């Protein structure tokens, strides 16, 4: 039996991970969880799975949960803040950590978990975006496996199995194109948060839904793929595939292209990461090839969806430039959702930050965290 912690248990990936655990009750024990504000769902999870440790990152919610746990006589330790997240990620008794928190907050607990020798099922792509060099070095030094939970990176990983890594010609990273595929810049001027949150294929949280609409999500995945698979940026090609059936592909030097196909359901890559290297039965719908009428592919429009272009530029420049890109994007998404900035201002402000801040510093935990704070403060003061 594998013992696991889930960081971000009440979010989209967290709750789908719980679905996998319910289906494989004999295979996993949930030891630790973290959440932010959703105390009602957290209480339901505590009652169902009986985790020993619960970390809450929101102060009022933490106090409320402490009282609820005590009043109902539940046996779990409730911990507050970043200290709590790190504790849940580094528990001696766990084997694997599912990092499904959104944003920079996942960096420190993930790095500390790696230093403790815990395998990582990584759904928090920002960790590799802002500190890929540091994270992959730590993983190698500590003998830790980093198993991608993103459907695209899971597909690439599966397509690499049994093949020589040095025979890769290119990675073909698929993208649905988001809800605004085919739009012009003029069309995007009137985009509202409500429209941007409606993704055509995937059910996701707010932040990743906006990122998917701007193609920043794909840009972050390009940087993530660079670090996970040690692949130059010039050999990572984004392919728009609206049906979201092919989750990504690897083209080899002999011309062969190996792909992983499946229904668009995050429980598939979650389960693959948790069970690796084994394959087990799944609660998800199986792919019916006879129901697929067509598989189409097109190039992304980098002039209209500038965030993807900016992500490639940040990745190529390296050092702390991806930290600037990520921090600026997180704040811009928040401001857009709160209707403080327009949709088209998102790439404009990100580019402004990339041209404003010094990125040419060593990638350390402190440097990443400090620069991230500077970028966020700059945007809040100017645009909030």
Curated annotation (Swiss-Prot):
Mn(2+) binds at residues 150, 152, 221. One of its GO terms (molecular function) is 1-deoxy-D-xylulose-5-phosphate reductoisomerase activity. InterPro entries: DXP_reductoisomerase, DXP_reductoisomerase_C, DXP_reductoisomerase_N, DXPR_C, DXPR_C_sf, NAD(P)-bd_dom_sf. Its EC number is 1.1.1.267. It comes from the Bacteria. Keywords: Isoprene biosynthesis, Manganese, Metal-binding, NADP, Oxidoreductase. It catalyses: 2-C-methyl-D-erythritol 4-phosphate + NADP(+) = 1-deoxy-D-xylulose 5-phosphate + NADPH + H(+). The keyword NADP applies. Pfam families: DXP_redisom_C, DXP_reductoisom, DXPR_C. PANTHER family: 1-DEOXY-D-XYLULOSE 5-PHOSPHATE REDUCTOISOMERASE, 1-DEOXY-D-XYLULOSE 5-PHOSPHATE REDUCTOISOMERASE, CHLOROPLASTIC. Catalyzes the NADPH-dependent rearrangement and reduction of 1-deoxy-D-xylulose-5-phosphate (DXP) to 2-C-methyl-D-erythritol 4-phosphate (MEP). Belongs to the DXR family. This is 1-deoxy-D-xylulose 5-phosphate reductoisomerase. It comes from Clostridium perfringens (strain SM101 / Type A). The gene is dxr.
């Amino acid at each position: 039996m594998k013992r696991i912690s889930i960081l971000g248990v009440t979010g989209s990936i967290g709750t789908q991970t719980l679905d996998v655990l319910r289906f494989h009750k004999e295979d996993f024990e949930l030891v630790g969880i973290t959440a932010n504000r959703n105390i009602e769902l957290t209480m339901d999870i505590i009652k169902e799975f009986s985790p020993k440790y619960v970390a809450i990152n929101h102060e009022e919610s933490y106090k409320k949960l402490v009282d609820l746990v005590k009043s109902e006589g539940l046996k779990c330790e409730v911990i507050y803040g970043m200290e709590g997240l790190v504790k849940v990620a580094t528990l001696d008794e766990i084997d694997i950590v599912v990092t499904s928190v959104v944003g920079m907050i996942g960096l420190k607990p993930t790095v500390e978990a790696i230093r403790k020798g815990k395998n990582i099922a990584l759904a928090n792509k920002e960790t590799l975006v802002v500190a890929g060099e540091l994270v992959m070095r730590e993983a190698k030094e500590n003998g830790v496996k980093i198993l991608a939970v993103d459907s695209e990176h899971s597909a690439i990983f599966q397509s690499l199995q049994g093949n020589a890594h040095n025979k890769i010609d290119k990675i073909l990273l698929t993208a649905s194109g988001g809800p605004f595929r085919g739009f012009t810049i003029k069309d995007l001027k009137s985009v509202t948060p409500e429209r941007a949150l409606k993704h055509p294929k995937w059910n996701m949280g707010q932040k990743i839904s906006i990122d998917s609409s701007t193609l920043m999500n794909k840009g972050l995945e390009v940087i993530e793929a660079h670090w996970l698979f040690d692949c130059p940026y010039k050999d990572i090609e984004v392919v728009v595939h609206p049906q979201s059936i092919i989750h990504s592909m690897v083209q080899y030097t002999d011309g062969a292209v190996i792909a992983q196909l499946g229904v668009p359901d995050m429980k598939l890559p979650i389960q693959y990461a948790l069970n690796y290297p084994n394959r087990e039965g799944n609660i998800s719908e199986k792919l019916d090839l006879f129901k697929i009428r067509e598989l189409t592919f097109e190039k992304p429009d980098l002039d209209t969806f500038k965030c993807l272009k900016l992500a490639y530029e940040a990745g190529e420049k390296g050092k702390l430039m991806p930290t600037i890109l990520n921090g600026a994007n997180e704040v811009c998404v928040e401001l857009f959702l709160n209707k403080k900035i327009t949709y088209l201002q998102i790439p404009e402000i990100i580019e402004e930050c990339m041209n404003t801040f010094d990125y040419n510093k060593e990638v350390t935990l402190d440097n990443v965290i400090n620069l991230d704070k500077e970028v966020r403060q700059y945007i809040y003061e100017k645009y909030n």
